[in-house]
Amino acid sequence: MSILEKVQPIETMLPARYYTMSTEDMEKRVREIKEKMGKMLCIPCHHYQKDEVVQFSDAIGDSLQLAQVAARNKEAKYIVFCGVHFMAETADMLTTDEQVVILPDMRAGCSMADMADIEQTERAWRELTTLFGDTMIPLTYVNSTAAIKAFCGRNGGATVTSSNAKKMVSWAFTQKERLVFLPDQHLGRNTAYDLGIELNQMAVWNPNTDSLEYSGNLEDIKVILWKGHCSVHQNFTVKNIESLRKSHPNMNIIVHPECCYEVVQASDYAGSTKYIIDTIEQAPSSSKWAIGTEMNLVNRLIQKHSDKEIISLNPFMCPCLTMNRIDLPHLLWALESIERGEQVNVIQVDKQVTKDAVLALNRMLERV
């Protein structure tokens, strides 16, 4: 190898050769590397990932389950995370310094997580403190950046997932009189309402105008919701439900709580990704279901439960575009880079951010 070759930087974009490889060859190479590395390698996959990636997963789950997998895994030196950026950050923060977390495609982000940056959040906290004093505790959905998790950790708050949101919101109200919930207003609103908090006791913080939007009395506000949302679940509407009720009156409708309040109220069931999966699995044969969540998962449930009639609540839905960034070529590239000792797309969260964020994560993990 020449000196020039030695100093060339490691590639940061998928090399062209992976575009020309056959699916069979790529699958064969992934299996070879997995067999060779054994327990030194762990590939966790989120439920929204493509089947071409999920087939190689060592663990598949929702955000809570994958956080627990990362926290428990002490054997794997390399964790190749098939999800989006905030999930890989969480895995890095919950694993040891000796473990390496890799995201196959760094473009796999999350629009919801990007709706709350740390500067906006700190500014909002200062403004809200002038209104409410020391009566607030922050909770962040795990679909947030490491910096936002760290902010919550520093301020006595915690993280939540859609699986444990009720438990964590209930806990938060044992700590303070008011709750600031970010970045997903819909999960926060749906959870708070389920716990008996009225809509006029909730306000929305708009980070674009630095203003608090509310209809009731300011002193009665118990929940401040960040004005963020999931770009996928935002596409399920009450019109979808009304249309389905007319065309399929016997269809059960189940949605994720990232859908808006009106959609959740008009549905028959609402719950986390795990809740949706479990409900469909336990449903009687020949039952009929319209599901309001990400399309890769819906398609997987359709394939797995051929004895049931399953459709998407929105007939024009597409998969989560950022989740779909992770594909077989990127997975193989990540694995071959490990094999060569030239890891690409390593996720490393700042140590102080990690220290603060882990406070928030552990407050959640201790209660589930």
Swiss-Prot record:
Cited InterPro entries? NadA (IPR003473), NadA_sf (IPR036094), Quinolinate_synth_A_type3 (IPR023515)
**MF (Gene Ontology):** 4 iron, 4 sulfur cluster binding; metal ion binding; quinolinate synthetase A activity
Q: What is its EC number?
A: 2.5.1.72
**Reactions listed under catalytic activity:** iminosuccinate + dihydroxyacetone phosphate = quinolinate + phosphate + 2 H2O + H(+)
Binding residues for iminosuccinate = 46, 63, 141-143, 162, 256-258, 273
Keyword flag Transport: no
The UniProt entry, under PANTHER family, shows: QUINOLINATE SYNTHASE, CHLOROPLASTIC, QUINOLINATE SYNTHETASE A
> Under what name is this protein listed?
Quinolinate synthase
